[in-house]
Regions:
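Short, low-complexity disordered leader/linker segments with a strong preference
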Residues: 1-34
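Flexible loop/hinge segments at secondary-structure junctions
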Residues: 22-347
Length: 347
């Protein structure tokens, strides 16, 4: 409890979302070049962009990161065109084999929010799993559909077209969201399944987290799935999603932390780090679309010392930068698993 309260007291400002960020202004403490280049997920970019100047000041490591999407990050580290990749989707067996000696290290934990644009509606829209999945299936198309209004009696939802917005690029956020849809809707699971590049039966696509958030901000009636930091940056209203306890919850730190309580006491493989649609044992506060995001690093690297130092810093001191951006600090057993994997990064 003291650790959690201490973390919550750390003050950090929400950063502006850019395309690439580095530590050009940080003064290195070592004479030799200590640069690292990474690429991948847009989901953790608000947090990574806080880490970069901090780790530069602490260790003189100059990190440059391009948020090109999880699929791009996996491809880049597999081809070794970057020093590390980042993905919200855990690597499949085939992807791990193709990477030829990579470790997958959880380094951040947050939630997929459901922002929407309903002009003149000040109440919080509540979304059941059936309603949310039916919107993305194209079965619910109006905001005043009885299936939507029955849990939003005081909202006076308008007769307005619903425009579901999805990621058009290979996206780890899409992986987490479609994994959730597959858990709560048998039709979605059988027809579309889980993936970074799902076939969407309804809606419009946009590239990147900033892209989908931008479409929603400009389109009355639209909604999407995106990391909570992007919803906040775009000042979007965020829906509450019903969990297995029947409660409607928001993607805040309490909800993410509650969802993480269902994890095993000891993590032995990154495939165990699944938090979408947690069982009732997670409690009434659990947010049902919480997810980890990962750094992918080669076990053999000429920059192994700096890479280990950066990733270790990220999963320890770097966690203190998370709460203001609504990234929940890693649970202790996840941190312990990360330490074991980081040790595998060698020259």
């Amino acid at each position: 409890m003291k650790r959690a309260l201490g973390l919550m007291l750390i003050v950090a400002s929400v950063v502006a979302i850019a395309f690439t960020v580095g530590t050009a202004g940080a003064a290195p403490v070592q004479k030799q070049d200590t640069s690292l280049t990474g690429a991948g997920a847009t989901f953790p970019f608000p947090l990574i962009s806080k880490w970069i100047p901090a780790v530069g000041s602490a260790y003189g490591i100059n990190v440059n990161y391009s948020p090109i999407g999880s699929g791009g990050g996996i491809a880049a580290i597999t081809a070794r065109t970057v020093d590390f990749g980042a993905s919200d989707a855990p690597l499949s067996g085939d992807q791990l084999n193709a990477c030829k000696g990579c470790v997958v290290v959880p380094w951040a934990l947050s939630a997929i929010s459901i922002p929407y644009n309903l002009p003149g509606i000040s109440c919080v829209v509540r979304l059941t799993p059936n309603v949310l999945s039916s919107i993305y299936l194209g079965d619910i198309t109006r905001w005043n559909d009885p299936k939507v209004t029955q849990n939003n009696g005081t909202c006076n939802l308008p007769d307005l077209k619903i425009t579901p917005v999805y990621r058009s690029d290979n996206s780890g956020s899409s992986y987490a969201f479609t994994d959730y849809l597959s858990n709560v809707n048998a039709t979605w699971k059988s027809k579309y399944g889980t993936g970074v590049n799902a076939q969407w039966p309804a809606g419009v696509g946009a590239k990147g987290s900033s892209g989908v958030a931008g479409v929603v901000s400009k389109t009355p009636g639209a909604l999407t799935y995106v990391d909570i930091a992007y919803s906040l940056k775009n000042k979007l209203r965020i829906g509450w999603v019903q969990n297995r306890s029947g409660k409607f919850t928001s993607p805040g730190l309490r909800g993410i932390k509650a969802a993480s309580t269902v994890l095993p006491r000891k993590i032995t493989d990154f495939t165990q780090l699944k938090l979408v649609d947690p069982p009732k044992t997670a409690g009434p506060l659990a947010y049902p679309i919480s997810t980890f995001t990962y750094v992918i690093a080669p076990t053999s690297s000429s920059k192994a010392a700096d890479l280990r130092k950066f990733v270790y810093w990220a999963v320890t001191r770097g966690q203190t930068y998370g709460p203001p951006l609504l990234f929940q600090p890693l649970p202790l057993q996840v941190q312990a698993y990360a330490f074991r994997e980081i040790k595998k990064i060698q020259s």
